[in-house]
């Protein structure tokens, strides 16, 4: 009787005690990627309303596989480490950008992240060599195009069928993991 009471009291104490503030939340450096020591750390209190900072900082828009990809909504030719200007960020709530401009910049940034088509290693890489290659290969591509047009394209039904199969397999695996964890939990509680 005492042991479960002590364990539950300990869990409640750990859950309700204020945690030390996170360094990532405290640092408000001008560059997001740079690790800097906080100049004037403040303890974060989640029960009181947060004050709005005077100068809004840009935030990451996409997170993929633990890496941050920043959508540079201003000049997309800048280096990837260049910070967003506060006027160009849609998260700051500025009314300077029209929604269609923001959407156009968003899609342009997404297109930049798409992988480029790959070419064989033995193909020439210079623009003049590519022009000569295009002139020579245009004659060779005609039979290849005819062959490609004769092959039936992969139907969308097949694509969606394969997608459904993969999703069903993932769902079955998730249910198996859940059943395993439930069995372990029942063994622990039953003892």
From Swiss-Prot:
Annotated segments matching region Disordered: 115-153
Gene3D superfamilies registered for this protein in UniProt: 6.10.250.1920
Signal peptide location: 1-24
Keywords per UniProt: Amidation, Cleavage on pair of basic residues, Hormone, Secreted, Signal
Compositional bias of kind Basic and acidic residues: 141-151
Subcellular location as annotated: Secreted
One Pfam family of this chain: CRF
GO molecular function: corticotropin-releasing hormone activity
Tissue-specificity statement: Produced by the hypothalamus.
Modified residues (Isoleucine amide): 189
Subunit structure of this chain's protein: Interacts (via C-terminus) with CRFR1 (via N-terminal extracellular domain).
Function: Hormone regulating the release of corticotropin from pituitary gland. Induces NLRP6 in intestinal epithelial cells, hence may influence gut microbiota profile.
Name of the protein in its database record: Corticoliberin
Species of the source: Sus scrofa
Lineage of source species: Eukaryota, Metazoa, Chordata, Craniata, Vertebrata
